[in-house]
Amino acid sequence: AFQGRDCLTEIVLPDSVTSLGAYAFYECGALTRVETGTGIVSLPECVFAQCASLQNVLFRGTIGKIGVQAFLVCVALQTLTLTDISIIEDSAFSGCYELRSIIVGDTLQTVLQNAFWDCGNLEAVYYLGGEDDWFELENNNDLSDLLFSTIYFYSEDEPSYGGNFWHYEDGKPQPW
């Protein structure tokens, strides 16, 4: 629909929009910000792929699935919040090499091959669940792309023992 349009710098989708087509905003090189409404529940294949300037993505609804290569080579993307996600498909964030941190909900069940391939700067994964949930996720999925990232587990209160835990401070993830 809008692929290759370099005049788009920001997209704010109203709640009445319930779906996006594959490749809808593919190669929109000047796009820096996307905000989805509550009507969007999944993102299709290559929907924002190769949007080289995309820095800020806000999901106001419950995004359950991110499709194949949805954010492929979005090289300016640095942080991401996926609190309600259940499926991240093949190569969804491959080549997002400026991605530094993500917040992932404990609803995550499936991470397919190369979901975070070539995200070499991904330092921190802030997981909203506990260690046992993460290890189960790890056993059932290929999370090798996250091998060099520190995984933090959510704890509202400061733990009395060591480990990688985090909490929200002023709306942002903060390690304990």
Describe each model-derived feature in a short phrase.
Residues 5-19, 29-42, 52-65, 75-87, ...:
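Structural signature of tandem-repeat unit edges
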Residues 72, 94, 116-117, 137-142:
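A structural signal for leucine-rich repeat
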Residues 167, 173-175:
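Short linear proline/tyrosine/threonine-rich motifs used for host-factor recruitment
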Residues 155, 168-169:
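Acidic surface patches and DE-rich sequence motifs
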Residues 137-138, 163-167:
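Short conserved micro-motifs at the rims of enzyme active sites and ligand-binding pockets
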Residues 142-143, 171:
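Noncatalytic linker/hinge segments flanking ATPase motor cores
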Residues 1-3, 21-26, 44-47, 67-70, ...:
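Consensus positions within tandem repeat domains that build extended binding/scaffold surfaces
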